[in-house]
C-alpha cells in the first residue's frame, strides 16, 4: 500500500486531540465563556479576534479569516505538510496509523533517529571535547557568538575515521546511519567509516526544529571539498528545504516577507544581528518546492540579498525563472562590492541591513539591468544576445498573465513591441536586423514560430497517472516529479496538484502537452491497483534513464583521466558521484520492482 492515511484514522486524531491544549502551546489563550480567545498568530493585531471553539473542534479569526481544525493549525503554524501534521499529532496521541506500517515510513523513522543521534554527537564534540577547540576558534572568527552557535545547533565532526561510527555501533544503529548517509561502507566491504570528518557541522532542520541533514565546513585538513552536504534521503529533499526556516518562521509570518541568501553562515550572521526572517538555499537552485515552503510560512514577498559583483548578478538571472514561474513578488538588494551578507551584517548591524533591504528594487529591474544595461540605447545585436540569455528564464514561466506581463516589461526596456519580443523569444532563429533602424520588422509575412516540441511519452504517462489519481504522488518516493524534463508537463503537474484538478490542468496546457497527456490517459488502466503498478513502473523507467544518462556523462568526462594520483578535485567528485548513482540505481530497481502479478505499464514509450 502507498502512504495514504485512512480517513477514519484522521478522524480519530481530530476527535482525540485537545485543540485548546495544542494551540495554547503557541498562543496565549484566555477563557471567554465556552470559547477561548487570543491575538491571532497569523496576522498582527492588538485586540483579540482569534477564537478556539473546543466543542466544535475548530478555530476562527474574525480579522484575517483564518480557520480550521487541529491538523490545519499544525500545517499553518508549524509549516508542515498535511501528512506530516497528521503523523505528528497521531504520534503524540498514540494513534496507530496504518500507513506507519509501510516500509518506507519505518525507514524514514530510522533515519530521523539516526540524524538526532548524529546532531547530539557533533554538538558534544564541539562543546565538551578538547578536539573541538579549533572548530570553536573558527566559529568565533566568523563572528558567530556561542549563543547563536547553540541556537542553531552547530557541532564538530573530528578528523577520526570512526568517531560517529563507533557511537552508532554501540547503539546498534549502523544500518540506520548508513541509510541516512552519515556513515559509508568501506571499499573492502568490512565495516563503516564516518562521512563527515574534520568539519564544523551545521544542522539543516525541518520547520519544526528537528535535524534532517547536515552541512559541513572543512577545517584544518586539506583533503576533500571545502563544503560537504548530506546526501538526500527519505527525510531530506534539498529542493524542498530552506536552511534556517525553523528559526525564521515566526518572523516571516509576522513580516509576511523572507530574506533569501545563498550560504548557511550568511543566514547565521543575519540572525545574529536581529534580521530573523532570513533563510538560505541548501546548495541548490530555487525550486517550486521552496516556494511552497515559503507560501506555508505566509511569505508574500521574497527579498534576495546578494553579492554586488558579477556572481550576484548571475544569481539574479538564475533565480528569476523559478520566482517568475511562481508569480512571486520579489525584490533584489545588492551588497557593496567585496561584501557578503555575513560580513556586511557584522559591520553595519541590523540597522544597516534593514536599510539595504528597504531600498531593494523589483526583481525584473535588476534582471533587465544585468542582461541589457544600455536598455533602449543598446544595439540590435546586444538586444538579441540579451534575449538569448532570457530564453531559459521565460521557458520556466507558464503561458498566462505573468508571462504576458513579462513580455511587456521586456518590450519597454528594449524599446520594442511585446509581440516582437514574444516572437523573438519563441524562435530559435534570430530576427533579421532591419535596414533602417533598431526595431525588428513587423511584416505580417514573418514566418510563424516553430511548433512546440512534443513532450516525452513516458513523462506524459507519469503526469496522466497523477491526474487520474493525485494520491499517487505519495508513492513517488524518489521525487521523479523533479526529473521531468518538459516544462509544460511540470507546469501541468503543478497546476493539478495545487488543487485545480485535471480539467483545469489540461485547459491551461499547450496543445502539444494536452495531446500527450490525453493519449496517456486513454491508455492508462482505470482500476486503482493496476494504475498504481503502472505508475511505479513509469517512475522506475524515468529514474533509471536519468541515472544512466548521468553515468554516461561521467564515464566520458573521466575516461581520459591520467593515473589515480593525478586526479583533479572535479574528477574525484565525479567518481564519488558515480558510486552514489550506482547505489541509487540499485535502490530504484529493488524498491520499484514490478508487482508479482505481472502488471506492467500500459506501454513502454521511447
From Swiss-Prot:
GO CC terms, sorted: cytoplasm; DNA-directed RNA polymerase complex; primosome complex
Region annotation (Disordered) ranges: 429-451
Residues bound to Mg(2+) 1: 262, 307
Record PROSITE patterns: TOPRIM
Enzyme nomenclature, EC number: 2.7.7.101
InterPro entries associated with the record: DNA_primase_core_N_sf, DNA_primase_DnaG, DNA_primase_Znf_CHC2, DnaG_bac, DNAG_N, DnaG_primase, TOPRIM_DnaG_bac, TOPRIM_dom
Pfam families in UniProt: DNAG_N, Toprim_2, Zn_ribbon_DnaG
Catalytic reaction annotation: ssDNA + n NTP = ssDNA/pppN(pN)n-1 hybrid + (n-1) diphosphate
Residues annotated to bind Mg(2+) 2: 307, 309
Cofactor(s) required, per the database record: Zn(2+); Mg(2+)
Ranges annotated as CHC2-type zinc finger: 40-64
Domain of life from the UniProt record: Bacteria
Keywords, alphabetical: DNA replication, DNA-binding, DNA-directed RNA polymerase, Magnesium, Metal-binding, Nucleotidyltransferase, Primosome, Transcription, Transferase, Zinc, Zinc-finger
Domain Toprim: 256-349
GO biological process, one term: DNA replication, synthesis of primer
Similarity section: Belongs to the DnaG primase family.
Domain notes: Contains an N-terminal zinc-binding domain, a central core domain that contains the primase activity, and a C-terminal DnaB-binding domain.
Record function comment: RNA polymerase that catalyzes the synthesis of short RNA molecules used as primers for DNA polymerase during DNA replication.
HAMAP family linked to this entry: DNA_primase_DnaG (MF_00974)
This protein's name: DNA primase
Gene encoding the protein: dnaG
Amino acid at each position: 500500500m502507498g502512504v495514504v492515511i485512512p480517513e477514519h484514522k484522521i478522524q480519530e486524531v481530530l476527535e482525540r486531540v485537545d485543540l485548546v491544549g495544542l494551540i495554547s502551546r503557541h498562543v496565549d489563550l484566555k477563557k471567554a465563556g465556552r470559547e477561548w480567545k487570543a491575538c491571532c498568530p497569523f496576522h498582527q493585531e492588538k485586540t483579540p479576534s482569534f477564537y478556539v471553539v473546543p466543542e466544535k473542534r475548530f478555530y476562527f479569526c474574525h480579522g484575517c479569516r483564518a480557520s480550521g481544525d487541529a491538523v490545519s493549525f499544525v500545517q499553518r503554524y508549524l509549516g508542515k505538510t498535511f501528512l506530516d501534521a497528521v503523523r505528528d499529532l497521531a504520534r503524540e496521541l498514540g494513534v496507530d496509523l496504518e500507513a506507519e506500517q509501510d516500509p518506507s515510513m519505518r525507514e524514514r523513522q530510522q533515519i530521523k533517529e539516526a540524524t538526532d543521534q548524529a546532531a547530539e554527537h557533533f554538538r558534544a564534540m564541539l562543546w565538551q571535547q578538547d578536539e573541538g577547540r579549533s572548530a570553536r576558534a573558527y566559529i568565533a572568527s566568523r563572528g558567530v557568538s556561542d549563543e547563536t552557535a547553540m541556537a542553531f545547533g552547530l557541532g564538530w565532526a573530528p578528523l577520526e575515521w570512526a568517531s560517529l561510527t563507533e557511537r552508532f555501533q554501540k547503539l546498534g544503529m549502523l544500518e540506520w546511519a548508513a541509510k541516512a548517509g552519515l556513515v559509508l561502507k568501506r571499499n573492502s566491504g568490512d565495516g563503516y567509516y564516518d562521512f563527515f570528518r574534520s568539519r564544523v557541522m551545521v544542522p539543516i532542520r525541518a520547520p519544526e526544529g528537528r535535524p534532517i541533514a547536515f552541512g559541513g565546513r572543512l577545517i584544518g585538513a586539506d583533503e576533500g571539498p571545502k563544503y560537504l552536504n548530506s546526501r538526500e534521503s527519505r527525510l531530506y529533499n534539498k529542493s524542498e528545504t530552506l536552511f534556517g526556516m525553523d528559526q525564521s518562521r515566526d518572523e516571516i509570518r509576522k513580516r509576511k516577507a523572507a530574506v533569501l541568501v545563498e550560504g548557511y553562515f550568511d543566514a547565521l550572521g543575519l540572525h545574529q544581528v536581529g534580521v530573523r526572517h532570513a533563510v538560505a538555499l541548501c546548495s541548490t537552485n530555487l525550486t517550486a518546492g521552496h516556494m511552497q515552503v515559503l507560501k506555508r510560512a505566509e511569505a508574500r514577498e521574497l527579498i534576495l540579498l546578494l553579492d554586488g559583483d558579477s556572481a550576484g548578478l548571475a544569481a539574479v538571472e538564475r533565480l528569476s525563472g523559478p520566482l517568475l514561474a511562481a508569480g512571486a513578488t520579489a525584490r533584489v538588494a545588492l551588497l557593496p562590492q567585496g561584501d557578503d551578507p555575513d560580513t556586511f551584517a557584522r559591520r553595519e548591524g541590523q540597522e544597516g541591513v534593514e536599510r539595504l533591504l528597504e531600498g531593494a528594487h523589483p526583481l525584473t529591474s535588476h534582471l533587465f539591468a544585468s542582461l541589457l544595461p544600455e536598455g533602449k540605447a543598446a544595439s540590435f545585436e546586444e538586444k538579441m544576445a540579451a534575449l538569448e540569455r532570457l530564453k531559459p528564464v521565460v521557458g520556466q514561466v507558464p503561458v498566462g498573465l505573468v508571462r504576458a506581463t513579462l513580455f511587456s516589461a521586456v518590450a519597454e526596456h528594449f524599446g520594442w513591441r511585446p509581440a516582437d519580443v514574444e516572437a523573438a523569444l519563441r524562435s530559435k532563429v534570430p530576427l533579421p536586423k532591419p535596414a533602417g533602424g533598431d526595431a525588428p520588422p513587423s511584416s505580417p509575412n514573418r514566418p510563424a514560430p516553430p511548433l512546440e516540441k512534443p513532450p516525452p511519452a513516458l513523462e506524459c504517462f507519469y503526469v496522466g497517472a497523477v491526474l487520474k489519481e493525485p494520491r499517487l504522488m505519495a508513492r513517488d518516493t524518489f521525487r521523479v516529479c523533479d526529473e521531468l524534463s518538459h516544462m509544460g508537463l511540470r507546469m501541468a503537474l503543478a497546476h493539478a496538484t495545487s488543487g485545480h484538478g485535471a480539467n483545469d490542468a489540461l485547459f491551461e496546457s499547450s496543445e502539444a502537452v494536452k495531446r500527450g497527456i490525453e493519449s496517456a490517459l486513454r491508455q492508462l488502466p482505470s482500476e486503482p491497483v493496476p494504475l498504481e503498478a503502472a505508475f511505479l513502473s513509469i517512475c522506475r523507467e524515468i529514474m533509471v534513464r536519468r541515472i544512466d544518462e548521468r553515468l554516461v556523462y561521467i564515464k566520458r568526462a573521466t575516461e581520459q583521466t591520467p593515473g589515480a594520483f593525478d586526479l583533479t578535485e572535479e574528477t574525484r567528485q565525479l567518481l564519488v558521484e558515480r558510486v552514489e548513482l550506482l547505489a541509487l540505481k540499485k535502490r530504484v530497481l529493488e524498491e520499484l520492482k514490478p508487482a508479482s502479478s505481472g502488471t506492467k505499464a500500459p506501454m513502454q514509450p521511447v
